Structure formats: C-alpha cells, structure tokens
Amino acid sequence: MIILVPAEQRLSLEGRIRVFELVPDPVTGDERLHRHGYSYCLDLAGGILAEYEPDELDQVTNSIGEPYAVYVSCQSMDAARTFLRDVLPGVDGLVDTNHFEILPASRFLALMGRHPEWDWRRQPSTDLQ
C-alpha cells in the first residue's frame, strides 16, 4: 500500500512513521519496522511515484497537489490494517491500495472502521455499503 500526502506534509508523515523506531535494511536500503508482532518494509524516499502511470499520477496531483509517497509492504492484511490505524488518523492525504483504488485517507479509515475485515486486495470499496 502507498500513503500519499501533499509534498509540504512530508516531514509530518515521516515523523508519524519514524516515531515507531525504524531500522535500516542493509540489503534494500529501505527501512524496517517491527511493531505489534508484525514486520514491515518501508520506502520513505518517495521513489514509488516513478512507478505510477501518468493517469494515476494525474489523479493524485489533481487531488492533493505535488505528492510525497511512502510505500509500505507487510505480511498480512492484519498487519496492514494495524499500521494504517496507527498512522492515518489526522492524515490529509490518500491511500493507494495497490489494487486499482486510490482513496482519501479519511474515507479509507472510515471504511476500515465499518468493515473491520475488509480485504481491499479482493474487494473494491465500491462493493461495501
């Protein structure tokens, strides 16, 4: 999943994440996090934006302006939900599920609250009521 915020909010988002005591991964250059029994790999450099299709990047830019992105990978949906519940409250940005949806962070959190077992890899938000 990818968390996107306006570029001017980069330090704020990084600060939220770095408070969790990340450790460098000597192999990938990314950062690792072990929290609540889960492992995460994070790319805080923003390089994931280079992988966006032009129309996706336009969608993001039209919504939040010049973006900054954090790529987060983890081992399970429970891990993903836990991380997002810890990081997203108060974030004025977007969540890219990496499964064809980019949603406002507040809406994403609301959907997780109403549908605690939601698996966005298999079910688009438009299927939720």
PLM region descriptions:
Residues 1-129:
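Acidic (Asp/Glu-rich) sequence patches and key acidic residues
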